């Protein structure tokens, strides 16, 4: 590994400086970004030297790890959060095969039944904004508790009701309850995982939202074929109830405002069963007093009223918008292919309902493989860039990314796989106009699912990287765009195919994706520079505010 400091430029050594022969890691995040920005001004001679000096590690408070949880515990926590987020897409798509039966049973038109789908999608995009803001302040466990209480109650009502008005209202509540868990999942990852390890964990956190649209039509088709449509909601009630019991007994509070790196004792409403048992064993008043003092500032914020408009501050950052829109379009393309697949295979291959449901299985497998493979690619590229710059990556330590090209490290993986997905989308569309073996389109569906899921996951990682500690808030915004763009592209694919044919309709979908992702080339090239300029402006603004405050005090 190359020596990170240039010996021709002497650097001031703090009292606790490391020996010269030690390798240098990414700057510890406990040193605020403004210090890095100010140090750039002190040594403007060389950009490489400037970066190296800012990458010098600093001692964190008490030298504590970023998270006290073990690697296996973190994997279980992320898996549990991912399963919690699985219920929203599961509930959305499992409903589709039963629409004709519901239309007949309630004696309503297809347009009226489709309105329940639209209502679900609208709430699926809006509800996480409230949940994300609440969980960032009150904690992840209270956020999950509210989500599942609403979701379980809605499922029970849907299983018992027989009126259109009740169906409309309860589907909206079902959407509001289940969709909030998606945003909290990435918040959990942001709480316990450092950027250098985040790739694989974010992928696992996204697997629920990827598998849901692919697997749920199969389950819904089986219920619609062999049972009464009410059993769809009984199944969701039983499944979610069985999940909630172990989840709320053992899932720990992770919000850093509440428990820090996991060492702090959470308030009563944030405790799981091990926390309660541990609290009972703490008999020494001094230890309890120290824990209360340590968490006083964190607990003070837990009762703040959630502000759903707070998430829109993300849109004030142009670089973030340039990342958000491609993420939404990627999932929109996925939903467009998913929505059009049933009609295409019925028209071309005359598949029955069960066979049509089975074609979603390869897409689910593609999404699952994406979750298992994408994270490793993302982490590998992160470490490759670190080695290239002579940077030592510290495990389980949060490290400053101000002078690290995190955009390039992430997008070098994201852009090629998305291009592969767009090529497969075009090929799929034109194959459906030809009399070819069914295995060809199915293989392309598998590759498209892998590609779009991988691209979406990597952009999720990048967004969480650029908003540390606010993963739930960023994910809520991504979810909003994903749902609204997905609803639009899913609604567009059928009339577009009728007007232009399968070949040109999917070609247009691919071209929309290419156009939406082209700004990411600028992000990859200038992203680090933009972040540094933003940090410098923030430091300058902070200095002016401090000076103004000092003048007022005088």
Curated annotation (Swiss-Prot):
Phomoidrides A and B (also known as CP-225,917 and CP-263,114) are potent inhibitors of Ras farnesyltransferase and squalene synthase. CP-225,917 and CP-263,114 inhibit Ras farnesyl transferase from rat brain with IC(50) values of 6 uM and 20 uoM, respectively. CP-225,917 inhibits squalene synthase with an IC(50) value of 43 uM and CP-263,114 with an IC(50) of 160 uM. It is a multi-pass membrane protein. The chain crosses the membrane at residues 76-96, 115-135, 142-162, 173-193, 202-222, 231-251, 311-331, 354-374, 413-433, 442-462, 473-493, 504-524. It is found in: Membrane. Its main location: membrane. Residues 39-48 have a biased composition (Basic and acidic residues). Glycans are attached at residues 6, 107, 114, 437. MFS-type transporter; part of the gene cluster that mediates the biosynthesis of the antihypercholesterolemic agents phomoidrides which are dimeric anhydrides. This is MFS-type transporter tstD. It comes from Talaromyces stipitatus (strain ATCC 10500 / CBS 375.48 / QM 6759 / NRRL 1006). The gene is tstD.
């Amino acid at each position: 590994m190359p020596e990170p400091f240039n010996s021709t430029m002497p650097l001031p050594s703090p009292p606790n400086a490391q020996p010269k022969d030690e390798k240098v890691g990414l700057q510890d995040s406990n040193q605020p970004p403004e210090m890095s920005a100010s140090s750039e001004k002190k040594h403007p001679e060389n950009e490489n030297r400037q970066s190296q000096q800012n990458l010098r590690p600093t001692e964190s408070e008490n030298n504590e790890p970023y998270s006290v949880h073990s690697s296996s515990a973190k994997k279980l926590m992320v898996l549990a959060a991912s399963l919690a987020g699985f219920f929203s897409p599961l509930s959305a798509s499992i409903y589709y095969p039963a629409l004709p039966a519901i239309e007949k049973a309630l004696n309503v038109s297809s347009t009226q039944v489709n309105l329940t789908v639209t209502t679900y999608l609208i709430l699926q995009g809006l509800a996480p904004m409230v949940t994300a803001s609440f969980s960032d302040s009150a904690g992840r466990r209270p956020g999950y508790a509210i989500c599942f209480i609403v979701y379980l109650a809605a499922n029970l009502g849907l299983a018992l009701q027989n009126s259109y008005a009740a169906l409309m209202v309860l589907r909206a509540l079902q959407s509001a309850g289940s969709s909030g868990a998606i945003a909290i999942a990435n918040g959990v990852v942001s709480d316990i995982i450092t950027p250098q390890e985040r790739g694989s964990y974010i992928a696992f956190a996204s697997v629920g939202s990827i598998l849901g649209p692919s697997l749920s039509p199969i389950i819904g088709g089986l219920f619609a074929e062999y049972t009464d449509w009410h059993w769809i909601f009984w199944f969701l009630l039983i499944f979610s109830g069985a999940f909630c019991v172990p989840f709320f007994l053992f899932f720990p509070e992770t919000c850093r405002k509440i428990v820090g790196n996991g060492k702090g004792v959470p308030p009563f409403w944030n405790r799981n069963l091990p926390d309660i048992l541990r609290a009972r064993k703490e008999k020494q008043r001094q230890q309890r007093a120290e824990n209360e003092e340590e968490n006083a500032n964190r607990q003070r914020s837990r009762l703040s009223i959630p502000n759903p408009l707070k998430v829109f501050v993300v849109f004030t950052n142009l670089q973030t918008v340039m990342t958000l829109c491609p993420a939404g379009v990627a999932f929109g393309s996925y939903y467009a292919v998913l929505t059009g697949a049933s009609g295409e295979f019925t028209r071309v291959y005359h598949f029955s309902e069960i066979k049509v449901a089975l074609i979603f299985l390869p897409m689910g497998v593609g999404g699952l493989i994406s979750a298992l493979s994408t994270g490793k690619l993302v982490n590998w590229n992160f470490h490759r860039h670190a080695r290239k710059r002579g940077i030592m990556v510290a495990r389980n330590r949060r490290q400053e990314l101000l002078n690290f090209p995190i955009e390039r490290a992430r997008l070098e993986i994201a852009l090629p796989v998305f291009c592969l997905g767009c090529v497969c989308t075009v090929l799929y569309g034109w194959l459906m106009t030809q009399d070819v073996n069914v295995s060809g389109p199915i293989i392309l569906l598998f590759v498209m699912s892998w590609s779009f899921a991988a691209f979406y996951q990597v952009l999720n990682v990048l967004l969480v990287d650029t908003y540390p500690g606010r993963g739930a808030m960023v994910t809520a915004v991504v979810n909003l765009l994903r749902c609204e763009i997905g609803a639009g592209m899913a609604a567009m694919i059928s009339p577009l195919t009728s007007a232009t044919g399968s070949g040109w309709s999917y070609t247009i979908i691919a071209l929309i994706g290419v156009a939406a992702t082209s700004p990411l080339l600028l992000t990859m090239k200038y992203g680090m520079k933009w972040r540094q300029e933003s940090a410098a402006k923030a430091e300058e603004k902070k200095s002016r505010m401090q000076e103004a405050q000092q003048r007022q005090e005088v």
